Design a protein with these regions (language model features):
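Intrinsically disordered, low-complexity, basic-enriched segments
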Residues: 1-65
């Protein structure tokens, strides 16, 4: 995965954590259910993730653990 994608994902993960949620659980819910509500609006994370390639986000989550 490219550096820009990794940087954006780090920002999204940080925003989810700052909102008080488990980033892995929220991202897993996003990729399995396809619902953007799993991603917080904090830090503009929801808008950022919508601009990313869904398959890359899915791979990111699959490689998390």
């Amino acid at each position: 995965m490219d550096a820009e994608f990794e940087s954006i994902m780090k920002e999204i993960v940080q925003a989810i954590a700052e909102a008080g949620y488990d980033p892995y659980a929220q991202l897993y819910g996003y990729v399995t259910k396809g619902k953007e509500e799993f991603i917080t609006r904090k830090g503009n994370a929801r808008e950022k993730i919508k601009k990313l390639n869904w398959l890359k986000v899915k791979q990111y989550v699959e490689n998390w653990k």
